[in-house]
Design a protein with these regions (language model features):
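Gram-negative outer-membrane beta-barrel transporters
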Residues: 53, 58-62, 80-188, 292-294
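Structural signature of outer-membrane beta-barrel domains
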Residues: 8-14, 21, 50-52, 61-65, ...
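Solvent-exposed loop segments that connect transmembrane elements
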Residues: 17-29, 68-83, 122-146, 186-209, ...
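C-terminal beta-barrel architecture of Gram-negative outer-membrane proteins
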Residues: 151-230, 254-255
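Repeated loop/turn-to-beta-strand initiation elements of outer-membrane beta-barrel proteins
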Residues: 1-3, 51-54, 106-109, 168-172, ...
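A general secondary-structure boundary signal
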Residues: 2, 45, 120, 164-171, ...
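C-terminal beta-signal and adjacent terminal beta-strands/loops
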Residues: 11, 178-196, 227-295
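Outer-membrane beta-barrel signature, preferentially recognizing the C-terminal barrel domain
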Residues: 2, 9-64, 74-103, 149-156, ...
């Protein structure tokens, strides 16, 4: 058994592509760039026994003063624009645990779970320039990002796998997984006064711009069959893997908010509403055959 504690503090310069509003053909740089600061701490513990191997980790990480740039079409200004988001701050903390349980000589049960909180902790500043002549569209606008969840990472996960290792190199596995509390990646532009304030003239439309969409929970069921051939100093393994055995075709894999804005004209009025989130979906039932050779 052992316990390990680690901590880190670092600062790194922004990526070269994030220092320019449009690095392909425009030398205009982001105003007053600063290094991104990173602070992290982690506690790991491991317990090994004749039947059970258990390990757990507790972690916390914070990044401050991040910079992101993007080129997009601005529907409110009716022009292509270059955007810089500065002062991005994120916090991640949580716990992970995993256990391998040897049920018998040939059977192994593996369990794993994690729970965390990944969110934006600061309201960054958004500067938007026209891609045509660098004229200002919006300068140092406050984005209501504080409290939004970080997209792309489930905050609750669980996995169970049962494996059988048979004679003569045969074996099989079956696993079930769960991912919950997932959100689309939020876009800072939508939460500025120019977009959410002017476009969301009613409370309903304002909430549509600033509310973050939660993705449905996801479940997976996979299986694999493998056969190993041992030689004097090498091994050949053939595996047939089956993914998404249930054949669910509408499992959302991830998503992000759109930067586009819709114009709605009921009569003589003009209303604005955000476009729907862009989502990607997991593969349907799939089969993979792999062959590996180790020597």
């Amino acid at each position: 058994r052992y316990i390990e504690i680690a901590a880190a503090a670092a600062a790194r310069t922004p990526r070269a592509g994030d220092l320019f509003f449009q690095p392909l053909y425009n030398n205009r740089t982001v105003d007053n760039p600063v290094p991104e600061r990173i602070y992290a701490a982690e506690l790991n513990c491991r317990l090994t026994g004749p039947v059970v191997d258990f390990q757990a980790a507790f972690f916390a990480a914070m990044t401050l003063d991040g910079i992101e740039t993007r080129t997009y079409y601005d529907d409110m200004a009716s022009v292509y624009c270059d955007m810089a988001v500065t002062g991005v701050g994120r916090m991640s903390c949580g716990a992970e645990a995993a256990a391998d349980i040897r049920l018998s000589y040939r059977w192994l049960l593996s369990l794993a779970a994690s729970a965390g909180c990944y969110e934006y902790i600061r309201d960054p500043r958004v500067t938007v320039l026209s891609d045509v002549d660098n004229s200002a569209v919006d300068v140092q606008a406050v984005s209501r990002m504080g409290g939004c969840e970080t997209g792309g990472a489930p905050q609750l996960t669980a996995l169970a796998e049962i494996a059988w290792f048979g004679p003569k190199g045969w074996g099989c596995r079956a696993s079930a997984g769960y991912a919950g509390r997932r959100y689309v990646e939020p876009m800072p532009l939508r939460r500025t006064d120019r977009i959410a304030g002017q476009g969301g003239i009613t409370r309903e439309f304002f909430d549509a711009f600033t509310r973050q969409e939660r993705l449905p929970d996801a479940f997976t069921l996979d299986a694999a069959l493998f056969k190993s051939f041992r030689f004097e100093r090498s091994r050949l393994t053939a595996s047939l893997m089956l993914r998404n055995l249930t054949g669910e075709a509408d499992t959302v894999y991830g998503g992000y908010e759109s930067l586009r804005v819709r114009r709605i004209r009921p009569g003589d009025d003009t209303l604005y509403a955000p476009h729907a989130s862009r989502c990607t979906y997991a593969w349907p039932r799939s089969f993979y055959l792999t062959i590996s050779y180790r020597f």
